[in-house]
Amino acid sequence: MEIKPVEVIDGVPVFKPSMMEFANFQYFIDEITKFGIENGIVKVIPPKEWLELLEGSPPAESLKTIQLDSPIQQQAKRWDKHENGVFSIENEYDNKSYNLTQWKNLAESLDSRISQGDFNDKTLKENCRVDSQQDCYDLAQLQILESDFWKTIAFSKPFYAVDENSSIFPYDLTLWNLNNLPDSINSSNRRLLTGQSKCIFPWHLDEQNKCSINYLHFGAPKQWYSIPSANTDQFLKILSKEPSSNKENCPAFIRHQNIITSPDFLRKNNIKFNRVVQFQHEFIITFPYCMYSGFNYGYNFGESIEFILDQQAVVRKQPLKCGCGNKKEERKSGPFSNLSYDSNESEQRGSITDNDNDLFQKVRSFDELLNHSSQELQNLEDNKNPLFSNINMNRPQSSSLRSTTPNGVNQFLNMNQTTISRISSPLLSRMMDLSNIVEPTLDDPGSKFKRKVLTPQLPQMNIPSNSSNFGTPSLTNTNSLLSNITATSTNPSTTTNGSQNHNNVNANGINTSAAASINNNISSTNNSANNSSSNNNVSTVPSSMMHSSTLNGTSGLGGDNDDNMLALSLATLANSATASPRLTLPPLSSPMNPNGHTSYNGNMMNNNSGNGSNGSNSYSNGVTTAAATTTSAPHNLSIVSPNPTYSPNPLSLYLTNSKNPLNSGLAPLSPSTSNIPFLKRNNVVTLNISREASKSPISSFVNDYRSPLGVSNPLMYSSTINDYSNGTGIRQNSNNINPLDAGPSFSPLHKKPKILNGNDNSNLDSNNFDYSFTGNKQESNPSILNNNTNNNDNYRTSSMNNNGNNYQAHSSKFGENEVIMSDHGKIYICRECNRQFSSGHHLTRHKKSVHSGEKPHSCPRCGKRFKRRDHVLQHLNKKIPCTQEMENTKLAES
């Protein structure tokens, strides 16, 4: 059934479809397209059945959601001094935000008679009804208003605004709901449009096969002007002749949408145009390559959306693309920005040179680097190197911890295959990706980056656990160590101390021939390492950190590859456990000293209570030295070194246990297959940013790990989940756990221990303080202090004397119900007035100034007392004489 217009008003077809014709959106658009392309725009009056579906619309709930941000004030200016009927529109943005009621008051240029408190449903409905408008529009009056508009266009500054997040259509409306068109309709750029009287929408020129639907919900009518697509080129040619068209700078000046012309100008230049008035509850549909403009007769509210026309009705004309910064289309977001037809597109694509393709590949490769994980890029690298495709197939970093649900929970608890991924931050994760794939170098000044080549992993050097002497070779004797390692890795058997070892294998199946060849070198340098000064850096260099050229003897220690400090530092910050409180750290049972003691200035202190590190270090005068061991070393200690022994991964700063590295209970390592060669030198200093002091107890994981750099600061809390520090996965003394077992430093109600300077060594009852909760306050319980100190039902801390500093725990000034933990941190609540504060300082000040009867501040003149100091200043600044001055004045008068 063919759909025809019921009438044509000033060249614009007007359709009044039946409900059956109107119900099929796609069919109706296909039928009226031929009329729209010929005339530019059409007017559609919906049937009464559809209007009945809008009964009671718009609802008050939808009107409340409308928020008009940064409306635009328009100013029309003539192109030249002559009255030629061509105007340019300048926009000025307002930084204010309005709701619908405030916007109507602004539109009427009246005082804000409706306050924010009157923003209720009744007020909204009254301001959105058409019969509440003061003017009743008829054709005769509209002609007078149109003539008045063009006479005063240069003297008015109307506002208009756009809301792209709201819609007034009922959500359950399925027919012609611009907020919910059928999925088969490719639509975009839906928005609410509202404007004041004489608000202007300049000449628009839509792209090929793009249409727009405009619906007027309520308010004053709109005046529309349109130029059919057949006359668009003529109109653009005439406008380009105007001196102010700025065609020399931008041939597509019409795309700026800042030009409007009067009907007299169009008649004078013999340009065919159409005109129509849009009333409320009517649709205006524009078609491709036609031009349209208009203005508002008063305050109104409409909604519009763009959609793609059927390809069979495409107009084979495409407007020019604007390339300057004033192009308005570039600021629009939608799926149709690249769907326009260009006749020269195939020729332009055919003229692309090979150099352009190479440049595109380079940009694409770098874009992939920034938008893909290091695992994906490493897989690409493995595929490019088939010789090493079978090496390290079970990559531990393949299970990324970036998701909220970790992969392989059992494996994570066993600390076998999980590595520290990129929990720190997205920025540090990208830094880690760059450090894994791109190696910065200073050798070639012409290129800032160079690709890395995978090198096979060299065997690790392992020290047998039954060795009697332990030490660390200094960097001055590393060349001999490197030569021994090279000989060990290349020869199946090695002669040590005049005897030949044929692939010696210990009970664990680990080849110890390399360790045996190194044992003498370590023993010879052990005493010198223990007695060295702080100027001698003591470290161990694993074989995986040595470059192939160094191992082959072509270059000494620190060859061409020690310039990659930037990549190492960035990856270290991204993977270091000390850089994020949420990451697991090395276990409390540090291999530094397994005896469970820590030495401070020669004083041994037992930390078996769980609050200190189970490991031990010896510190003398601030200089760290290797702990000298006696006849035999424990079985769980392989290397004793004051500095952390590097793992085979050069990007890790954790201690390694060479006896059983897979089941040692250490913290997960950062990507263990990284192949960045790095040699540690005396004159190289790496930056380590630690947030150990700010470790949040809420973000603590299953295990309590500590960085090897923070052994001197024992943990003041114990995990409340499980304790795996003993390697068994079973918490000791689990029957003594109580809800307050976290300790004072763990609880958010306690502050950090206060440091008291001086040599005050006086402590109460063996430096133990016990606290019990009574209501909302923490009070010291003398009876508990005199009882057994092993009572686990109360808080207990210890005071440590270290270099004259006493660490003493003290109670918080806030009650338990005054501090609430939320997702954003602590919230302090005043229990008297229920006000919330972001810090304890504000809560304390609020209590003193509002709820406290104390008045500590007094006026220096009259002695009047006030609660706050600023109240005294306000009192003094007032030109009111003080009490004492008034008394002196009365005495003088008498």
UniProtKB/Swiss-Prot annotation:
Annotated stretches, region: Disordered: 324-355, 521-558, 756-810
Every JmjN domain range: 12-53
UniProt cross-references to Gene3D superfamilies, sorted A to Z: Classic Zinc Finger, Cupin
Name of the protein in question: Transcriptional activator/repressor GIS1
Any single GO CC term annotated in Swiss-Prot or TrEMBL for this entry: mitochondrion
Compartments it resides in: Nucleus
UniProt-listed InterPro entries: JmjC_dom, JmjN, Znf_C2H2_sf, Znf_C2H2_type
GO MF annotations, alphabetized: DNA-binding transcription repressor activity, RNA polymerase II-specific; histone H3K36 demethylase activity; histone H3K9 demethylase activity; RNA polymerase II cis-regulatory region sequence-specific DNA binding; zinc ion binding
Miscellaneous comment as given in the Swiss-Prot or TrEMBL entry: Present with 432 molecules/cell in log phase SD medium.
The keyword Coiled coil is assigned to this record: yes
Biased composition (Polar residues): 335-354, 769-785, 795-810
Low complexity compositional bias, start-end: 521-554, 756-768
Statement: the UniProt record of this protein carries the keyword rRNA-binding: no
